[in-house]
Amino acid sequence: MSHILAFFILFCDREKGGERVRNRIYLRPELYDLSQGTRIKFVRIFRHLTQDNISDDLGITGENKRRTLTRYEKGDRNQSKSRLQELSKILLVNDNLIKQYEFKCVSDILYFLLWLEEMFPKIRIDLGTNDETINLFFDEWNNMRDKKQKMIINYEEYFEWKINYKVKEDSNEWNNKN
């Protein structure tokens, strides 16, 4: 099955105080799996960037300059750590959100959960732990989810928060304290 990502921007005109107001309605891209390549593609589309845009910013030239990025997005090629950092700067995203997860530290699991919600938006997770890092993450995440649900923030603002979120103790090694 082809992994298709799609997004739409719709404009909705309405009257407000006697004036015609145009509201932008954003429908998010669809995430079909949680592979590193699909996550990179999701953010690229969210940012309204083409493979050409990113290839240019990475300094890739030649007739087939998009090939490298296509291979990243399909998972056929792994980036070096420095290339991943360059890519995250271009995409304006925390590099931990688009890295390959090894699940050797708490932060990998927490970042994975942020992506899991993109596939299953109504998911609710309670790990029932006493770990301070995990509890802080869930407090902050649930606060932002509530703001989105109450329409205090829109999806774009919520997703911006997610892709730039930094787990407070990123370097913690995963252990079985609980």
Task: Name what the model sees in each region.
Residues 11-34, 38, 42, 78, ...:
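Charged, helix-prone or intrinsically disordered regulatory segments positioned adjacent to compact structured domains
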Residues 53-58, 87:
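Short alpha-helical "recognition helix" segments of helix-turn-helix
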Residues 140-178:
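Charged, low-complexity intrinsically disordered regulatory/assembly segments
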Residues 41-44, 51:
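Short, cationic motifs built from Arg/Lys/His that form the positively charged side of catalytic pockets
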Residues 46, 57, 90:
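Residues within the alpha-helical elements of helix-turn-helix
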Residues 59-79, 100-104:
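Recognition helix of helix-turn-helix/homeodomain-like DNA-binding domains
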